């Protein structure tokens, strides 16, 4: 599971010119799910995202997390994070397919809400063609990826 995390002053998602979600200061999180991801990957990303110290305190950088400062998160599913180039054309065979990915993505959103504050967690519209408007702060962009699990670990998850 991958996440591209951007510190933002504001962010919003629209679909067909309709506002779906918006946040003020906080994090915009683009989330990619690969075919072999499980609940363990969800737990890892949720824990890391909420603990990342990307915000200042009293002029000192990298001191506070989104949770410490009670800020919002805007999460957007993005299967293109699991691409591979064939020449100049991307393919997305490594990405988890539709319904299964949506289930794991919803699990990710639920766990964020359970581990933090569900009213602070916003998201786009899964599977829709979205416009994501991000007002970067810094800019600060962090890439996270859950560690590969051994095959024996995956068998336990099934």
Swiss-Prot record:
InterPro entries: Daa-tRNA_deacyls_DTD (IPR003732), DTD-like_sf (IPR023509). One of its GO terms (biological process) is tRNA metabolic process. A motif (Gly-cisPro motif, important for rejection of L-amino acids) lies at residues 138-139. One of its GO terms (molecular function) is D-tyrosyl-tRNA(Tyr) deacylase activity. CDD domains: Dtyr_deacylase. It is found in: Cytoplasm. Pfam families: Tyr_Deacylase. It catalyses: glycyl-tRNA(Ala) + H2O = tRNA(Ala) + glycine + H(+); a D-aminoacyl-tRNA + H2O = a tRNA + a D-alpha-amino acid + H(+). Its main location: cytoplasm. Its EC number is 3.1.1.96. Keywords: Cytoplasm, Hydrolase, RNA-binding, tRNA-binding. It comes from the Eukaryota. Signal peptide: none annotated. GO terms for cellular component: cytoplasm. An aminoacyl-tRNA editing enzyme that deacylates mischarged D-aminoacyl-tRNAs. Hydrolyzes correctly charged, achiral, glycyl-tRNA(Gly). Deacylates mischarged endogenous and E.coli glycyl-tRNA(Ala), protecting cells against glycine mischarging by AlaRS. Acts via tRNA-based rather than protein-based catalysis; rejects L-amino acids rather than detecting D-amino acids in the active site. NCBIfam families: D-aminoacyl-tRNA deacylase. A Gly-cisPro motif from one monomer fits into the active site of the other monomer to allow specific chiral rejection of L-amino acids. Homodimer. Belongs to the DTD family. This is D-aminoacyl-tRNA deacylase. It comes from Drosophila melanogaster (Fruit fly). The gene is Dtd.
């Amino acid at each position: 599971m991958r996440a591209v995390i951007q510190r933002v002053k504001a962010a919003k998602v629209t679909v067909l010119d309709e506002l779906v979600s918006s946040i003020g200061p906080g994090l915009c999180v683009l989330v990619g799910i690969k075919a072999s991801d499980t609940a363990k990957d969800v737990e890892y990303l949720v824990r890391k995202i909420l603990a990342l110290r990307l915000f200042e305190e009293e002029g000192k950088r990298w001191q506070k997390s989104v949770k410490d400062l009670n800020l919002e998160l805007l999460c957007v599913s993005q299967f293109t994070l699991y691409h591979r180039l064939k020449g100049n054309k991307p393919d997305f065979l490594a990405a988890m397919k539709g319904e299964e990915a949506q289930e794991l993505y919803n699990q990710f959103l639920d766990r964020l809400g359970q581990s933090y504050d569900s009213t602070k967690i916003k998201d786009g519209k899964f599977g829709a063609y979205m416009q994501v408007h991000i007002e970067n702060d810094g800019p600060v962009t962090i890439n996270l990826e859950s560690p590969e699990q051994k095959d024996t670990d995956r068998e336990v998850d099934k």
